[in-house]
Amino acid sequence: MANAYERFNLHSTPEKFYIEACDDGADDVLVIDRVSTEMTLAGIKDIPPSGITRPICGVMGTVRLVAGMYLIVITRKRKVGDLFGHTVWKAVEFDVISYKKTILHLTDIQMQDNKTFLTMINNVLNTDGFYFCTDYDLTHTQQRLSNTSPDFQEMSLLERADQRFMWNGNLLREIIAQPELHKFAFPVIHGFIVMKPCCINGKVFEWIIISRRSCFRAGVRYYVRGIDSEGHAANFVETEQIVQFNNARASFVQTRGSIPFFWSQRPNLKYKPKPLISKDTNHMDGLRRHFESQVLIYGKQVILNLVNQKGSELPLEQAFAKMVSSMENGFIKYIAFDFHKECSKMRWHRLQILVDAVSDMQEEFGYFMVSSDGKVLSEQSGTFRSNCMDCLDRTNVIQSLLARRSLQSQLQRMGVLHVGQKIEEQADFEKIYKNAWADNANACAKQYAGTGALKTDFTRTGKRTHWGLVMDGWNSMIRYYKNNFSDGFRQDSIDLFLGNYSVDETDSLTPLHVKKDWKFLLLPVIMVVAFSMCIICLLMAGDTWTETLAYVLFWGMASALTAAVIVVNGREFVDAPKLVQKEKMD
């Protein structure tokens, strides 16, 4: 495999960027013309002494905004750990540098738009969870890497990366098109990685979780649900648990993703908007596309649908069950488990019902395992695909339980655990295990819903606590605010970053300029004024109590009526995406 360079210096002159590879023995320099935007390969001797020099950790890519092209570089990284001798890094800080020396050629409106687009790019970059490795392919599971051809293994990291999980693929299009430049860049995944040295029975082993978020149908909680026409599911995450001991290694893979047919749940100021199933689309076609690709990549599928089997979630569960049954595909099995009903009144021990119900299937699927001499001992023949409404809180709890069961078998087979010993009895490791899975839940939740996960007290401690309920309430309030009043901007940021929307410098007006209806401006003002007057009348009583009551009732009714009108027209008051028209299923 052609590794990427690991250390760089960026030399900037008014005319060009010179990105110097600083690895031992390297003589290559990537030259970017700031006027023509052309990229070429040169040598160290071509770097002019007049340039301003700074060290950088890597090239994220380039993006076109209103002012022209911008170079995105990684300026700070933090070591996560070593994966089979390869250092895994977390990208911590970035810099977005304009090719143009000035933006004075722009109009005031263009300057404002460019500033907004820059804020969007930085919004995504500041979302925690970007990881990379310069000499190892993080986009693939252990099993996929094991089953590759010699030709595949000779490819550069950019050529061989799984496009589903390469979040800077759009930003690197120009570099990818020139193979001689491939060593100057690497795939960056988005999600979560934790690597922990652990010890049981005096035997030290490495335990790892890698969660890879798909960049297909990527987005935020309420604006991206279901699937697209290609069968890509919203909030699709591949989670791989890896254990290494004495050069032997094993991995267990699970997936999560939105219920894979066409439905939506647009924010409308209500705490829980009603999900709507599309009446005008071919659900079976989309469902088949989704599961055909899943079976091709992962083998047999066991769907664990954890949504409520009552209320607004019931139609989704019924439709999903009916569609899977209609497929008549022997590689796909459907299991519905009403998580909230089964675990109501703090009865979290009832999760074991589901774990026991799928135990035979988990035994059948197995896991990928390689002996210390490199021989493949077993492969994973199927995958559990878990989902709830968001594929976050309930999903993560179930995934952690299934992963523990797989790990129990792997550690016994490797000789770390004695026969009859259970992971749950190893207090030190159990604490590491639970906290890591809770951290995984928080990372996935922040990236999709904007806050940490719910129910992480159970993941961390093995039991539900009253403090955990309080924190869930707080996170739910934060989610409500973000989902209604800031997620449109967050969705636009992701669409711009991934190339779902491309800025055209020749456009005089961008989609950012959407005129708001008069109701959007006037009604909130009326409501605030009416409510304020109601409070003032309560505090400053009139001459008689009847006069005071009349004023309070008048202003109270005015504020209540205005609030009702706002709620009825809720979708006009939420922060909606502007750049890419999202499907409306209603």
Curated annotation (Swiss-Prot):
Segments for region (Essential for phosphatidylinositol-4-phosphate phosphatase activity): 451-586
One GO CC term on file: Golgi membrane
Keywords carried by this UniProt record: Endoplasmic reticulum, Golgi apparatus, Hydrolase, Membrane, Transmembrane, Transmembrane helix
EC number: 3.1.3.64
Keyword Transmembrane recorded: yes
Keyword Transmembrane helix: yes
Compartments in which it is found: Endoplasmic reticulum membrane; Golgi apparatus membrane
Tree of life domain: Eukaryota
Topology class, membrane: Multi-pass membrane protein
Record's catalysed reaction(s): a 1,2-diacyl-sn-glycero-3-phospho-(1D-myo-inositol-3-phosphate) + H2O = a 1,2-diacyl-sn-glycero-3-phospho-(1D-myo-inositol) + phosphate; a 1,2-diacyl-sn-glycero-3-phospho-(1D-myo-inositol 4-phosphate) + H2O = a 1,2-diacyl-sn-glycero-3-phospho-(1D-myo-inositol) + phosphate
Lumenal side: 541-547
Stretches of the chain found on the membrane's Cytoplasmic side: 1-519, 569-586
Described purpose of this protein according to its UniProt entry: Phosphoinositide phosphatase which catalyzes the hydrolysis of phosphatidylinositol 4-phosphate (PtdIns(4)P), phosphatidylinositol 3-phosphate (PtdIns(3)P) and has low activity towards phosphatidylinositol-3,5-bisphosphate (PtdIns(3,5)P2).
Protein name as annotated: Phosphatidylinositol-3-phosphatase SAC1-A
